[in-house]
Amino acid sequence: MIPSLTILWPNLSAPAIEETRFSYKFCHSMSKQLCEEAGLRVSWVNYSGDPTLGEMLPGIDGDRVLVVTDPETVLSAPAVIAMIMCIENGFIACGPVYNHTISPDQTAALPVSYVDIETYLEVAEMIAEREENRHSAVESLDPACVLYRLDCLEQLPIECRLSEIPPSITNLNIGEVAVAKGALVHYGFKNDFEREDLVELVPESAKRILDIGCAIGGYGKRLKTVRPEIFLMGVEQNPVMAQSAERYYDDVVRCPVEEVNLTDNFDLVNCGDILEHLRDPWSILKRLNSLLRHGGYLILSVPNAGHWSVVRDLLKGRFRYVPAGLLCVTHLRWFTESSIRNALEEAGFSIETFQRKQIPPTPRGQAFIRNMCAAGYGDEKSLTTNEFIIRAVKR
């Protein structure tokens, strides 16, 4: 029988970024849902700031306490159970493995990548089965998510704050802390990728580049590293992100892409995962065409609405928005290979390079694709493609 536990969850103010605000709510509600669906006996306690143990202990129900300090964390029932089993083996505290973490000891060896909640759960189950009851003692844990024995927490000073628990409990010298190798916890929905895949498509002839929707500047950071001589201008409507991007760009225009007023002739326009967020991407493509010199380039990436994970969810009557990914909450438009090809053609572009980014499907995904294609209802190339990477030339 799984012991009851209390989960302390951070109630933090999200930055003024729509996806992040959604992510904070999504991760909390999804973690609760996944634990409840598995029948776990969990008491949830929200906290603000960095409270002391004296403030939190009276609200704890059960002899196990899971302290979450990062609101962009998704818990799965297999992960919670694996951590509890680790504690049952005599450790005073236990942490999970993550998809992303600051701790090398807690980096998950994923058998396959996941792309949404359903595939995350599938991978979490695979890891829990593969690493059943495996744990390893470590010197320290990533504080994002740690399970403690209540009796150990009660030995700490009541003025000890939640952020101080990890080093303080280690200093008690009353037992070891460990990592539950079968406990996969998802962390993070931040999109700060440097997009090397798009940077690699920039031709040597491009000297003046416009980056639409530059976010916090990951693309510019990478591009300026390999091509420091390039003049790089970004467009970003979110002031928080724009301020971050200014470190890597020669200029950042703070406004919606629909309102940008530029007359310069650029050698290249970069549009990484932007079209799907716009109300009228077809008009924007024509506008971007007008900003390019004759023979100039448009490099873009766009998610594929025909990916197997989306198709499978639709067939099951599901359409679950997520903070980032194929079904990002801020997506307004959807493209397949034929529709993005048509949009570029009508906007005055000729496609020079067309790449299909394909994350290997999970075992259940492979079975779904195989069955759909065998029944004549699916195209394997489309079902296995999660994103299109395109370089087009202005005609």
Predicted regions and their residues:
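Conserved N-terminal segment of class I S-adenosyl-L-methionine
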Residues: A183-D264, L268-N270, W282-L285, K316, ...
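Short, acidic, metal-binding catalytic loop of nucleotide-sugar glycosyltransferases
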Residues: S23-L40
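S-adenosyl-L-methionine-dependent methyltransferase catalytic module, highlighting the catalytic core
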Residues: E132, S136, S140-A144, E154-P157, ...
